[in-house]
Amino acid sequence: MKYILFLFLICVSTLAAGELKVVSISPALTELICFLGKEKLLVGRSEVCNYPESVKKLPVAGRLAIPFVEKTVGLKPDLLVANDLVNPGVKAALERSGINTLVMPCRSMADYKKCVEVLGKELNASEAAARELERIARWENKPRKKLDLKILWVVWDTPLLTPGRRALLHDIIVKTGAENATGEFDQEYMRPSFDKLLKKDIDVIIWSASSAGWKQRRVWQKFSAVQKKRVLEDLHQDSLLRPGPRLPEAVDNLMKQLEKWSAK
């Protein structure tokens, strides 16, 4: 009798997970849900959730971290998945409508691993989650050679914004074997002065800002990285800036691009 009851509970649990309807308004978490083999559960996305390509056919239920309450409620999801930038008042409104809201920070690889674990349990994808955690562990523990490069990663230029050591971009630079030029600051992002940066003898500039013609500005012409044409601008932003399944490969590709300038 106990064995029959056990089988019944397993079937009910599996059925419940199979019928779950999910809205994700975080691009990184949308990618993760699909990577875990649970894309079929998605009934809505944010307007910036664009990978894999197949999710673009889903209804748009919000912007990044901003769910459209009426639209989301109309999709009748059981669960909304978002990062921790969601307004608490909006979260409360959705929960009053009967929608469970799972809010998780997703700013680092440590956050990503926690998201893998949590979504693995919530979406009945524990085996896929375990495989992903093993894959990430192998990647993190892989031997890497040190690159003799000091990197300035420009997130924005007006005002100037660069990563401190709490930022995902700092982790990425370190994983390539290089040094983050503004990694001594114990914060996520910072606004350094040009005078201090010029004293650091920057080897490479990674440019994620959208400004055109920036290299012609007099202040940037003073950097040896610009003078030597050691600038990376055409990186695949989504795979690098989202802590998700594609990040390890994106970091390895970045490392290969940086290697040509190491020890030169």
What is the predicted function of each stretch?
Residues 15-18:
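Boundary at the C-terminal end of the N-terminal hydrophobic targeting segment
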Residues 21-85, 181:
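A short, structured surface patch at a secondary-structure boundary
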Residues 46, 168-189, 209, 233-234:
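His/Asp/Glu-enriched short active-site or ligand-binding loop at hydrolase and phosphoryl-transfer sites
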Residues 20, 110-121, 130, 141-143, ...:
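Structured C-terminal subdomain patch of bacterial secreted/periplasmic proteins
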Residues 69-76, 97, 191-201:
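Short helices/loops that flank or line small-molecule/ion binding pockets
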Residues 20-33, 127-176:
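Basic- and aromatic-lined ligand-binding clefts that recognize polyanionic substrates
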Residues 3-12:
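Sec-dependent N-terminal signal peptides
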Residues 86-96, 199, 204-223:
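A ligand-binding cleft/hinge motif common to bilobed small-molecule-binding domains
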